[in-house]
């Protein structure tokens, strides 16, 4: 069965039990519905995941208690990292203790964060999860398995939008959850049941395309990382600011909104488009659909083109944007 073949490949790469979905969004939603968390810490840049949690907290009503999204400050109140123990008298935990509930049910981290390419201390949150009994889930889409190994840092579940680096050709939608072997098989079975009842099964053709793509995954991403380094070294000498680097993806800012718009419109080889992880270089002006992101910021997903060709295209686009 093609679906099990591609899941087995992903299991071999990440080291857990893989469950594929029709999209990254459906994978994230499936985990939320499976855990049904009451108290959540959310660190996500991707707007779709933010919306999924927002809708869940608005619609879900457990024993007449609204689902609560905790802040980082509240998490730090709950857990004393120096003593490696919970602060029982924490105001953020006391209401949960009084109702005999966990201080935290789900910790969702997007690492690195999109589009600012910021990192979080996964191991600190793993300690917090161990103390509270929470599930630690990592959206590792932006780094890919070659850039980050969340299970080695204490994660329980890893999520990828396989549309991006795993597929790598911008020709399919897909998502996957990988469950660490420390969790019971019952948890994975619940995810499989959720997938079936929600109709979030990945199509046969898309599954075959993903299996095809996994055969070149390492070749593609290694080439993208090598090219990325060349482009960033060139960009460091240009009039740009706030350069945040991650292998194969980075963000930078120009001086004004008009310059950012002009840069994208002036590209000849690279595409001015959303998404990332494909074999073509994409430049995304995210502010056009997410106004919470700076209007001067551009996110670049490097493809497999020759570095000199990308630099030439960027150079003429920067001149047009002056």
Where on the chain are the PLM-derived regions?
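Mobile, glycine-enriched helix-loop/loop "lid" segments at the mouths of ligand-binding/catalytic clefts
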Residues: 1, 182-195, 270-282
